[in-house]
């Protein structure tokens, strides 16, 4: 009897654990170097989990750096380099807020307490259903004292629907077309833009962002050229555009929701320094020691989450843009290079991408396994051109 009870308790714990893990958010930090004249970024040190945020469900607080996984195998920092500027980007994605995720509203709002954040990037799928609008306002208002930019995912237009989990392992032969949005997209967009954040859904912008005085550096403004696409997963992405300031900006940043190869190739072709994306949930349900089983894009599973270098042509046959049954031809990458002012095509073949593991889940599958919810702070250190 005692053995049977122990086995029953073990089975119950195994079933309950993925629900528990889905409500244990963590903050991951990345340190990346921007070298003048070089596309993409280099890791400065291993990423680590920051345990300094309070646990909103238990009041506990940790203070250690905890290095994890393959992302620990990165380039060692050259401590002799003295960056000319530095900005810290808070990357949030896939909140999927609804009335049952009040805990996540509190967590996101608490991130505003990190005064070293200089910029906020929001990469889509903010809703699960329409009840999330007021929660999003409460979650993001404390962060809107900072400059920011956003793009949308499908769950900023259409509410989440129940899908059998095995659905993601097999391509849809006849995908369902949802033509009429049922979420308060216009109201949410107005909330974000009225707070001064840049709408990058198939749009561009240029911002002057302050690199604060830190570690002996003086404060200075840097020019950040911004580009973005609407959600590639549902074919709302148009050909990438870049602002006129792209070639001369201190930093070139791109946002998209779903990291499809056709979009990453375009940003590699125009020498973006960093692309921020979400959508994959890091795989959401992963095998310990193996990783993601599916990422719902055309990328290899190794690109399901984290920071990666992306080479143009990594995927041989990128999925085409399909919108409401229409298949669009590939974008002319040479024309894009010309628009971006990239004269050396051999240099414009790579970029760096951060694929967020996301903070939320659908209310229909509120579980995670070996893939906790994450927010990320990405520190970009720009090296001086006279080094």
Briefly describe each language-model feature range:
Residues 34, 98-210:
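Core catalytic region of metal-dependent phosphoesterases/phosphodiesterases
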């Amino acid at each position: 009897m005692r053995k049977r009870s122990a086995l029953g308790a073990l089975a119950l714990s195994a079933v309950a654990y993925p629900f528990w893990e889905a409500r244990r958010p963590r903050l991951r930090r990345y340190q990346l170097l921007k070298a003048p004249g070089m596309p993409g970024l280099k890791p400065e040190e291993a990423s680590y989990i920051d345990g300094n945020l309070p646990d909103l469900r238990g009041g506990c607080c940790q203070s250690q750096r905890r290095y994890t996984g393959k992302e620990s195998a990165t380039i060692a920092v050259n401590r002799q380099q003295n960056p000319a500027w530095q900005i810290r980007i808070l990357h949030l994605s896939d909140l999927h807020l609804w009335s049952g995720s009040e805990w996540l509203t509190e967590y996101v709002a608490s991130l505003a307490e990190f005064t070293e954040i200089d910029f906020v990037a929001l990469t889509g799928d903010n809703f699960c259903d329409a009840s999330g609008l007021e929660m999003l306002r409460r979650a993001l208002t404390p962060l809107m004292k900072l400059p920011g930019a956003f793009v949308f995912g499908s769950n900023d237009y259409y509410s989440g629907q129940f899908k059998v989990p095995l659905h993601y392992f097999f391509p849809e032969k006849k995908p369902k077309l949802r033509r009429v949005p049922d979420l308060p997209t216009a109201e949410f967009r107005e909330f974000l833009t009225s707070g001064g954040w840049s709408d990058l859904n198939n749009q561009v912008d240029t911002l002057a962002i302050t690199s604060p005085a830190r570690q002996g550096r003086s404060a200075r403004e840097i020019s950040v050229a911004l580009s973005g696409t609407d959600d590639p997963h549902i074919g709302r992405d148009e050909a990438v555009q870049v602002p006129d300031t792209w070639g001369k900006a201190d930093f070139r940043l791109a946002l998209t929701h779903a990291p499809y190869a056709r979009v990453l190739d375009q940003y590699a072709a125009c020498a973006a320094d960093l692309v921020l994306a979400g959508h994959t949930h890091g795989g959401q349900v992963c095998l310990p020691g193996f990783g993601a089983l599916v990422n719902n894009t055309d990328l290899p599973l190794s690109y399901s989450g984290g920071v990666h270098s992306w080479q143009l042509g990594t995927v041989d046959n990128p999925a085409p843009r399909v919108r409401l049954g229409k298949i669009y031809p590939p974008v002319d990458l040479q024309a894009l290079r010309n628009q971006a002012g990239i004269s050396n095509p051999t240099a414009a073949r790579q970029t760096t991408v951060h694929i967020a593991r996301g903070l939320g889940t659908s209310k229909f599958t509120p579980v995670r396994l070996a893939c906790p919810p994450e927010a990320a702070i990405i520190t970009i250190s720009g090296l001086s051109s006279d080094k």
